[in-house]
Each structure stands twice: as structure tokens, then as C-alpha cells.
Amino acid sequence: MRTDGLTGILENLFGELMHGVSGKGGFMLNHKDRGLLRSLERVSAADASVTTRTGSSIAAHVAHVGYGLSLLNRWSQGENPFGGADWAAAWKKTSVTEPEWEALRIQLRDEGAKWLVVLRTPREVQDVELSGMIGSIAHLAYHVGAIRQISVNAVGPAESQR
């Protein structure tokens, strides 16, 4: 199946989650929401290191998403990186220093930018691959929500602030 008819949709939804809402409104986030990357700029390393009752932290969420995007980017280049993937690794390190926090945000930004190019570029895919591409957007939305539940500094604008 070709993704030609879907690339704009995939790009818009993923881009909105990462970079925020442009124009009058969005499909995933509230009007004027700055998106994940700019929200994370307002989170200190100390705040990113606070663990929840389940043991996760914002730093762990960001590491997990950055790692997942790196695997997707490798897949887009013809590799099959999923068999040996260590999904648990990102969740093991919950606290970060300021330099480590900056590095995690840079990795997320860079891997997200690469994945955005993949989403906007028409390609031939199997159903399972298209499911993974669409699933990456839903998965990112989950983590945006989870991060925003952990720290008030990462929260976007309320619907009433339109």
C-alpha cells in the first residue's frame, strides 16, 4: 500500500504533538498549545527526575520516546531493529543531571525531526508497517499526556484559554 494519501495527515498529527498547534486550532492539542518539545523546555532536570508512584519520571518517558523514534528511523532506512530492542532500558534511569536532560531533549528533537520526514515522504508499506506509523502518533500522544500529568510545568493551555 502506498502512503501518498496519508502523508499530510500523518505529518500534521505527529508535528502538532511535537511542535504545537499552528493557526486557529488543532486536532490533538488545544489552541495555542506549544507541543511537547517546547513544553519540555520549561521542565528542569530536577522536575524531570521526579518519580511517580509507578516509578516512572518525565526523563524516563522522554528517553523511551526518543529511543522508540530512533528504532522507527532505523526501520525507515531498511533495518529491522525491533527484534533486539531493549525497551526496558529507558525506564531504568529515572533521574538526570541538567546536561543529561538537555541531551535527552536533543535526542527527542532530532529523532522526532527525522521521523517527521519519514511520515511526510510517500512510500510503499505493508499493513503492519502502516499500523506502526499510525501507532507512533498514538503512542506519542499517550506519552505527552503522561508527561503532562507528572509536572505542571509541562502542561499545555486549558481548553478555556482559547
Walk through the language-model features, giving the residues of each:
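Short, contiguous alpha-helical
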Residues: M1-D33, L37-L40, A45-A90, E124-R162
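Acidic/histidine-rich alpha-helical segments that form the ligand environment
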Residues: A90-A141
